[in-house]
Amino acid sequence: MGAKHVSRDAARSQSGLDGVPTFLASAAGARTRLRTLPAVRDARVEIVLPGAARITLVEREAVGRWVASDNVEWFIDAAGVLFPSIDRTGAPGLRVYDERAPRSAGERIDPPALVEAALRLAALAPGELRADATDLRVVMTAGANGLVLRTGARWEVRFGSAERFDEKLSLARRFLRDNPTRRLDYVDVRSPDRIVFSPN
């Protein structure tokens, strides 16, 4: 069956083929039903005589974890699709916390560039930006600050959208490198043409 995120029983049940006589079974219908499972990107179904079916699933590849505002942790793929998994170790430990409305399985976080940017921030090592940038937490805020990197030292970097993310990250790195001990509440790089920080 080739399943990591979907149990054999769930796939068998979703296919709708259990107990269906071979001459009435529809491989196309079973494939369509299987593709409604959020963790399934595609499926191949073969009806085999005298009375069996062979199901092969192509599952989504988890690139990280997306924690919704209701504390449900979803796996997320590079296209931004959220899905559950029977394998809790089946995704990298990179986490993004979403403070916006709760999410559901199969929902897509748009644009994919936002997912990529958030996971790049989640991959930063403690102390990589500056010595007190530890206990990092990547957050999608509900307000205008958008994508935010919060630190255990109680200061944050505000990135906003994923537009021009590389420039924003470079600007934040440069500012933090040049100000390794400055007391901060926030560094705002939402506009890469101008940096705002507090206290200034």
Which positions does each model-derived feature cover?
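Charged, solvent-exposed interaction patches on well-folded alpha/beta domains
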Residues: 10-22, 42-200
